[in-house]
From Swiss-Prot:
One of its GO terms (biological process) is transcription by RNA polymerase II. GO terms for molecular function: chromatin binding; protein heterodimerization activity. This is Transcription initiation factor TFIID subunit 11. Belongs to the TAF11 family. It comes from Saccharomyces cerevisiae (strain ATCC 204508 / S288c) (Baker's yeast). It is found in: Nucleus. The modification Phosphoserine is found at residues 236, 238. The gene is TAF11. Residues 131-329 form the Histone-fold domain. Functions as a component of the DNA-binding general transcription factor complex TFIID. Binding of TFIID to a promoter (with or without TATA element) is the initial step in pre-initiation complex (PIC) formation. TFIID plays a key role in the regulation of gene expression by RNA polymerase II through different activities such as transcription activator interaction, core promoter recognition and selectivity, TFIIA and TFIIB interaction, chromatin modification (histone acetylation by TAF1), facilitation of DNA opening and initiation of transcription.
């Protein structure tokens, strides 16, 4: 099995001291920060598109003016301010006059609109000519698609327990197509939300693994350096290599790997040059290589799932959202299977 290609390279277990240098540590640290920063920009852009439709969040907020209150005490109030009429004061007579003017203006515009009203065919042509390529393709597919006439008529006759006419069948066929389209659109939105949440989970994993990689590499690098003065000059950065990592008790694999990594990070024998210290360094290199493979394997991009099929969970969640949004859909009592009214067994 080929190893996943990525921005980071593994450390060989043989002849590794020449690789573990200060320059390698800072270049790898910079690479990890750069990858996480690019992923952060991508995640922020995706979340912004999901929440605001691509517009800036600041444009959706109402900017309230900031008032500066004077804390000086007023000893005497100005007499003119008591009898002063407030600005922009509107009296009932002004409101009635404004409503009368608006009514006359609307009547005039209504007469003009009736003369300039386009025919239905002209409106349809105007709509089609102003669609882009993607919208035109979707419109043509939706316009040509129709539900099966026989199945619609059979289903309606079964529910109504009578033969339905042809015009009712055409009406139910059109309404059913619109209803199915709304459910599918909601299912696509649900799928996009699920993919976005998975993207956030992958980003959190990559951030956590990147933080561990910097600690492991720093611990390995400074365990090789013997010059104490040189070590003190570069060791005081933002990466606490002796800080243990947290884990969850219900995740056995993560608990085992994190416990082993914490014991290696907090070990004082790495600074020595005996056989035990070499074994600890090899174990730390092995842990580092595992994290490198995981870091390279993670991908926060969700564009590769754009053409993925809809799942039953998406349709089920879309149906639930549709019922909440419409708030007028009656309960399907005929589907009840004994838990509620038991109408299916009557």
């Amino acid at each position: 099995m080929t190893e996943p290609q990525g921005p980071l390279d593994t450390i060989p277990k043989v002849n590794y001291p020449p690789i573990l240098t200060i320059a390698n540590y800072f270049s790898t640290k910079q690479m990890i920060d750069q990858v996480i920063s690019e992923d952060q920009d991508y995640v922020t852009w995706k979340l912004q598109n999901l929440r605001t439709g691509g517009t800036s969040i600041n444009n959706q907020l109402n900017k309230y003016p900031k008032y500066k209150y004077q804390k000086t005490r007023i000893n005497q109030q100005d007499p003119d301010s008591i009898n002063k009429v407030p600005e922009n004061l509107i009296f009932p007579q002004d409101i009635l006059q404004q409503q009368t003017q608006n009514s006359n203006y609307e009547d005039t515009n209504t007469n003009e609109d009736e003369n300039e009203k386009l025919a239905q065919d002209e409106q349809f042509k105007l709509l089609v000519t102003n669609l882009d390529k993607d919208q035109t393709n979707r419109f043509e597919v939706f316009h040509r698609t129709s539900l099966n006439k026989t199945q619609v008529k059979k289903l309606a006759s079964t529910v109504a327990n009578q033969t339905i006419s042809e015009n009712i069948r055409v009406f139910l066929q059109a309404v059913g197509k619109i209803y199915a389209g709304e459910i599918i659109e909601l299912a696509m939105i649900v799928k996009n939300k699920w993919l976005t949440s998975q993207m956030c989970i992958e980003f959190d994993k990559r951030t956590k693994i990147g933080y561990k990689l910097k600690k492991y590499l720093k611990k390995l690098t400074f365990s090789i350096i013997e010059n104490q003065q040189y070590k003190q000059d570069y060791q005081s950065d933002s990466v606490p290599e002796d800080e243990p990592d947290f884990y969850f008790d219900d995740e056995e694999v993560d608990k085992r790997e994190t416990t082993l990594g914490n014991s290696l990070l907090q070990s004082k024998s790495l600074q020595q040059s005996d056989h035990n210290s070499q074994d600890l360094k090899l174990q730390l290199i092995e842990q580092y290589n595992k994290l490198v493979l995981q870091f390279n394997k993670l991908d926060v991009s969700i564009e590769k799932y754009n053409n993925s099929p809809l799942l039953p969970e998406h349709i089920r969640e879309a149906w639930r959202l549709y019922r909440l949004q419409s708030d007028t859909l009656p309960n399907a009592y005929w589907r009840t299977q004994g838990e509620g009214q038991g109408s299916m067994f009557r």
